[in-house]
Amino acid sequence: MDLKTAVFNAARDGKLKLLQKLLENKSDREVLKLMAEKTNGATPLLMASRYGHLELVEFLMECCCAPVELGGSVNFDGEVIEGAPPLWAASAAGHLKVVQSLLGHGASVNNTTLTNSTPLRAACFDGHLDIVRYLVEHQADLEVANRHGHTCLMISCYKGHREIAQFLLEKGADVNRRSVKGNTALHDCAESGSLEIMKMLLKFGASMEKDGYGMTPLLSASVTGHTNIVDFLTAHPQTGLAERISALELLGATFVDKKRDLLGALQYWKRAMELRHSEADCMRREEPLEPEPAYDCSREVSTAEELDGLIADPDDMRMQALLIRERILGPAHPDTSYYIRYRGAVYADSGNFERCIRLWKYALDMQQSNLEPLSPMTASSLLSFAELFSFMLQDRAKGLLGAGVSFQQLMEILCRSVLEIERAVKQPRPSPDPDPAQLSKLLSIILHLICLLEKLPCSPEQDQHKKETIYRFLKLQACGRNGFSPLHLAVDHNTTCVGRYPVCKFPSLQVASVLLECGADVNSRDLDDNSPLHVAASNNHPDIMKLLISGGTHFDSTNALQQTACDLLDHTQLAKSLIQPINHTTLQCLAARAIIRHRLVYRGSIPERLEAFVLLHR
């Protein structure tokens, strides 16, 4: 074990004497370097603060001059917090004496993590009232919000820490502050079921505002199923009749899909209907002109008799819940499409794939019409289709009875996936560049869909449609992680892992072949200057390497580390013996290598296209 690791472990475990022994006879410069170095992303002081080793913390600051503000990575409840300063870690873990010591040695009370979380917010999150009081006494700013605009008061309300919320309010916390998505502390109480804190917020002047989705605290409580909040707010004088009706209807939908309590749902729907009929002239509900096939053409019930009849048809009740939720929340709210997808998954689990696909396509329509390009929710929907189609194809291959996958079904989802890439890359400026992680995920999903399509028989017309779509996809020139083109991804084993369930296995010779046929650039480069051939070599796949070579790639072109594809082949694998460099090296390649090796001046002496060729061998 090296000295850096030994020092880190001693600090983490609170072994002061061992740490002193490790550092004896070390120069001040060596000690300072050890204090600033990170192991697993954390400094010794950060670890000692995280685990509450007071004597060790003071030794590190006083005798080792450990940097008191230097942040790092620290784990809480399985989540890695990046850029956390020692004071944040001590506050989150509830170590008051360590907090006092750090502040006494000059730690900034408002220093934040990478997500802009303060030590005060960390203490509020886990309910450490004594630390909250101490930090506020030492000028902690109550109103510093995290990157989502979520304040200390909001998190205290959401976590149900009544005493902390009361303390913050008494110290002047803004009771009506809004987050980035427009929600207030009242919304956090509603979503967590914290009724007593909600009553306190109202006494301090909290107002019932709508968030960015148009949700009031009452509707938020209905969505999360907190009946205590719904009962309280439906009787509150700030709540109008229309909102009371919507809240009860929405709560009934929550009872169907979240609590799986159909009888409970009926009771809330009856209460809503009684209120609606009590004001018939102004509370009439608008009906859609055409029933939605995805909902099996169901319509919302409008009379008490129709409502009573639902108990005999649980499936119709579930469609009622989806109809009600879409009407009240609208298609842009995440819960609307989420529960449509949830209901479709239940149908798939029972073998009713047709109903599942109809519902999922309807949810995908909503997402692509209302969400930003490359939304994680849209990507999740597209991945679910790929996983479902893979499962259905496996059943067919095993000879099991069940619905088969048609070429048209798969092709439609491929087209929808390509559309999502188009939406992302063709956004009008100054829109931000597409998120590389989400773009990479969607590119991988598309390759899995192409792989599944290659397993299905198709007519010449269908094959032409497929290849035109792939050509359109390639023309977008979208790249994923590390600048990987679709062809890079097709020959990389990491593309296999796109979700929780297996879809296709990569590297895929079939997918690489159809991409090349449709115009993929065989000499495209990633950010490390690797060609697809380099990636295929790293994966020890000689058949794909031969395919790429026959497609015109330069066998001896080098990457940023001056490595050829042959250099990357595993010497212990058979691939090395199957790929013979002499068979794929031209005189032109040898000449280019000689120019590079002897550092000959060639720019301006040869045609520009040959200059580019020489650069491939640098």
Curated annotation (Swiss-Prot):
Keywords tagged on the record: ANK repeat, Repeat, TPR repeat, Ubl conjugation pathway
GO molecular function: ubiquitin-like ligase-substrate adaptor activity
TPR repeat start-end pairs: 245-279, 337-370
One Gene Ontology term from the biological process aspect of the record: proteasome-mediated ubiquitin-dependent protein catabolic process
Family, as annotated: Belongs to the fem-1 family.
Quaternary structure and partners: Component of a CRL2 E3 ubiquitin-protein ligase complex, also named ECS (Elongin BC-CUL2/5-SOCS-box protein) complex.
Protein name per its UniProtKB record: Protein fem-1 homolog C
The gene coding this protein: fem1c
